[in-house]
Structures are given as C-alpha cells and as structure tokens.
Amino acid sequence: MLDRTPPDAYDNGDRVPVIVLPGIWEPWRFMLPLAKVLHAEGHPIYPVPGLRLNGAPLDASAEKVAEALSEHDAPRVVLVAHSKGGLVGKQLMLHPKVGHRVAGLVALCSPFGGSTLSLPVLARTPLGLFSPANSALTALAAEQAVNAKIVSIGSSYDEMVPNGTHLEGAHNITLEMAGHFRPLVSPSAQQLVLQEVRRFDTSPDPGH
C-alpha cells in the first residue's frame, strides 16, 4: 500500500524544527524512517510536499522550500537532507530572505561535488545536475560562506556517488557502512543524524 502519512503528522515538539529534504525522484515520505526518529526526540518535522519528486532545477527546488519555510513562524530550523536534498538545502541557506533562519544542514550522501557516474547524455535531464561540470553545481560549490554550518555524512562506499561526499569547510563524517540509501534506515546512522541536529539546537531543555 502507498504510504498516506499526512504532511502535518509529526509537526509538534519542543526542540528545533527539522525540514526534511529528500533526494531526486524521492517523495518526502521517503524520509519518514529518519523523521520518526527525530520526532521521537522532540523535533517537529516539516516536510515540503511542494517539492513533489524533487526533479526541478536546483534554484526552483530551493524556492519551493523557501516558500514552505515562510509559512512557519519558527525563528530557526535545521535541514536534514538526503542526496540532492543536501544541494537544495545549501542553496536555501544562501537565500536572501530566509537563509538566515537555517541554523544548519545535516546531509546524508549528498553529491556536493557531483557524481562521476553522470553521463553527457543526461546533461539536459534533471540528472544533469549531478555532472561535476554542471553550471548550477559549480556555482553552488563556489559559495563557501555557509559550509561551516553543514554536516556532510557519507558512506564508506556510495554506489551513486563513488567519488564521495566531501565538502570543503564542512564537518565531514564517513560512516562504517556502504550504500546510498542504507543510512536512511540504519539505526546507527539515524542516531548520528540526531546527534548532529542537536549540535545546531539552541532550544532550552524541556522542563527547564
């Protein structure tokens, strides 16, 4: 059966809100295994249904997230992203109107330097974004002011991003597991994401 979890199912909590950003061709519910772990620890979860399957160009995707963020009154949020979602998240951090509201980005398996699997024949498709020579990707890479607020978590081997997920100036972590999708459902990777989200969380401890 198709998952029909409504977007507001996990929007309550007393910790810093988390906006979840899936990868390309992934619906927001693809992030549910990780979102549920974060919500159980008090983080409201804000998905962005307007991204649909996240196949739009980078700037258009970031604008959709900016619109969604504008609908929430939380002064600060943390972004938790998978794959292309990490690129969208960094683009959002550079947004002139809402970028300042992003406390940090925790990205899983995000190809900040593109993927060596990208082929020239894909250049005019949504997958063309992942070419290391793509103009939108290289422009994003040149913007390094926000990198210190990014945690890039990569697998020991990623079949979709074999060249790795290292981002200059970011906090880079390599998991002791392989796979592009496995970290989303791995308890140890989920706990690591939670730990890194907490580094950006300035909310007072509940009950204090």
Regions found by a protein language model. Give the residues of each.
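Generic secondary-structure transition motif, activating predominantly at the C-termini of alpha-helices
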Residues: 2-6, 69, 73, 141-144, ...
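A broad structural signal for short, well-ordered beta-strand segments within beta-sheet-rich domains
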Residues: 14, 102, 169-170
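Generic hydrophobic alpha-helical membrane-segment signal
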Residues: 5, 10-11, 97, 122, ...
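Alpha/beta-hydrolase fold catalytic core
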Residues: 1-16, 40, 208
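Serine-dependent carboxylesterase/thioesterase catalytic core
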Residues: 18-29, 33, 37-148, 160
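C-terminal catalytic-base region of ester-bond hydrolases, centering on the histidine
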Residues: 146-208
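Short secondary-structure boundary/capping segments
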Residues: 9-10, 69, 141-144, 163-165, ...
